[in-house]
Each structure stands twice: as C-alpha cells, then as structure tokens.
A protein has these predicted regions:
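Non-catalytic, hydrophobic alpha-helical segments
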Residues: 12, 54, 165-169, 184, ...
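Conserved beta-loop-beta element that borders a ligand/cofactor-binding pocket
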Residues: 87-90, 95, 113-136
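Glycine/proline-rich active-site loop of Rossmann-fold NAD(P)-dependent oxidoreductases
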Residues: 135-141, 145-146, 172-182, 205-207
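A conserved pocket-lining segment of Rossmann-fold NAD(P)-dependent short-chain dehydrogenase/reductase
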Residues: 125-126, 139-160, 164
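N-terminal Rossmann NAD(P)H-binding glycine-rich loop of SDR-like oxidoreductase domains
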Residues: 1-24
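Glycine-rich Rossmann NAD(P)(H)-binding loop
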Residues: 151-156, 182-189, 203
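Mobile cap/lid helix-loop segments that border enzyme active or cofactor-binding sites
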Residues: 189, 196-248
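NAD(P)H-binding glycine-rich loop region in Rossmannoid oxidoreductase-like domains
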Residues: 22-86, 97-106
C-alpha cells in the first residue's frame, strides 16, 4: 500500500514513515524539502500518484492567529483537492485532544477549521487527536513564563511520547477509515505544574514552576479536564518516567 505522509520529515512524520516502512508499506515522505508544497500545491499530484492513503502531520510555522488559520486552510484545501483527483481512499490527519473545547485559542480554531474541511470533503477520513507530547514541555513552559517563573494553569494533562503518537497514526492509516475521531493519550495524568517541572528537569532547565489559580493556557482559561482524553482513547505504551530516563 502506498501511503504519502505530508510533513513526513518532521518529528512525527519521520516516525510514521519508519513505522509504515517497517510493516512493508510504501511510505513516501512529502515536505518542502522533498519538493512538495501543500500551500501552493506544487508537487502534490506527482507525490499522490498511485497512493491509497494520505497522512497529514504538518504544522504551521507560525502560531499567530491569522497565520495558523491561513496555513491549515490552504494546506488542507490543496491536499483534499489533489486527493479527490488522484482517487485517494483515506485521508488521515493528526489533530489535538480537546480541540473542540479550546476554541478561545486561535491555534485550536484553526485546527477545528481543518477538521471541518476534512469532514465536508467527501474523502473517507480518520482524525487522530493526540494529547500534548512529552517533547513539548519546554515550549509549553516558555509560553507560560513570567519574569523567569513558569506560571501553570490549574489543569490536568495526559502527555504522550511522540513515538506512540506516530504508531497510532500509522496503525490508523492502514486501517479502515472511521469517518470520525480517534483519540490517543499517555498512560498517566499529571497536574500541569508537575508535568512542566518534570519535563524541564529532563532538559536541565532550572526555572521554578508554580500553579496560579487564575493561570491561563496559551492565554485562555480552561476547565481542569479540557486537555484530557475520553474513556475510549488508545493509551500509549511509554510513561513519562521511561521517556525521561532515555534522555539522560
């Protein structure tokens, strides 16, 4: 089976390509570095020739509200158009657990737009929503830092190893389209403060972390469970402790 992985040279995409190849599939990594530009459509038709499945794990280079919306809207439009013309039978997109609950944040409004376009396209699809990755701890801390202190929102988080996300995406890609959402999450739930502290420790980052009762997540007030997966989510195999031990 030929599977084209859009964003196939990045953190998740490279792992998806490796997992598919390991199981005997023809996995094609498509990205600007391989001559495929989903914003203009350049190289898409050639990459999709003979493909059964397209996996989209791209992300916007800018998280500014207008820029991220423009990225996902244009990229998704170009992909779906090319897929319809090529006869692709399954579109798989990576999204984020809680997207529908996080609409006060521009990034998640853009992801919701992406999901809606996929649903309305007529192309059979599966949307894989993942929780935040272990690897994102430092970036999340950066977004919450005030005067050298990380000010965490009073929420819970169920982070996951990027490799387990890639495994779930690859498994979904070679399965039957669900025409809906599947969720994947890590095995443990943490207070956001605790996760950030553990993640920073792995990087040798000494910033103090505190929880502020009125603390915001990307500028928005959340309910405690907004970032948690539902009861039917697939659970990744790798714990934060196991992943952390591998980094030292």
């Amino acid at each position: 089976m030929k599977v084209v992985v859009i964003g196939g040279t990045g953190l998740i995409g490279s792992k998806v390509v490796a997992a598919l190849t390991e199981h005997g599939h023809e996995a094609v990594a498509a990205s600007p570095s391989t001559g495929v530009d989903t914003l203009t459509g350049e190289g898409l038709a050639e990459a999709l020739a003979g493909a059964s499945v397209v996996v989209d794990v791209t992300n916007s280079p800018s998280f500014a509200d207008d820029a991220v919306l423009d990225f996902f809207r244009r990229s998704t439009e170009q992909q779906l158009k090319a897929e319809s013309e090529a006869g692709v039978a399954h579109h798989v997109a990576l999204s984020v657990v809680g997207t529908d609950r996080l609409q006060a944040i521009g990034y998640f409004r853009a992801k919701q737009t992406q999901e809606d376009m996929i649903r309305e396209s007529g192309v059979p699809f599966s949307i894989v929503r993942a929780t935040q990755f272990f690897e994102f701890a430092q970036g999340l801390a950066d977004s919450a830092t005030q005067d050298g202190t990380v000010v965490a929102a009073p929420i819970k988080i169920q982070p996951i190893f990027s490799g387990d996300v890639a495994t779930a995406v690859a498994r979904t890609a070679v399965g039957t389209p669900v025409n809906g959402i599947v969720e994947v999450a890590g095995p443990d739930t943490f207070a956001f403060e605790d996760f950030l502290r553990k993640g920073l420790a792995v990087q040798g980052d000494p910033r103090p972390v505190v929880t502020e009762p009125q603390g915001l997540y990307w500028g928005a007030a959340l309910q405690e469970s907004d970032l948690l997966a539902g009861p039917d989510a697939s659970i990744g195999a790798t714990s934060l402790a196991e992943w952390s031990a591998r980094q030292t």
